[in-house]
Amino acid sequence: MEFDVTIEIPKGNRNKYEIDHETGRIRLDRMLFTSTRYPDDYGFIDETLGEDGDPLDALVLLEEPTFPGCVIRCRALGMFRMRDEKGGDDKVLCVPASDQRASWRTEIDDVSEFHRLEIQHFFEVYKDLEPGKSVEGAHWVGRDEAEEEIRQSFQREADRIAREGH
């Protein structure tokens, strides 16, 4: 299964950018309150709707950071299941579909345990100092479960468009 991911935040940033889905412009939402930095390029899977009412989040494993607004054709390795103050807030872990350096990665276990712990630690603490924000229930699941969530998120977005007419 392949899909497009739009990057909002490059690896190593503390600035939290968001794409305004009405205008397409990139907005600085805030600087993270903690000293943590995004462990990988971070964005969303296009044409999806996650359980939190936003597009389904994604992390893309790359050798070099990209830039906000960059679109990458990806495939899933697994997913980090978590909840925040708005409900389900899963993060799909991906690699670029055409990157030969990543062709051997097909499952979550192909990502080192240490790197998975880095990602987990980031998402467990990155909202710690922000009033009214919380994170809970974080754990990793494999590619099959990630792909099922992606399919459900595509369907949620299609249903939303059918209901609202746009």
What is each model feature region?
Residues 1-166:
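Hydrophobic N-terminal alpha-helices or hydrophobic patches in metabolic proteins across all domains
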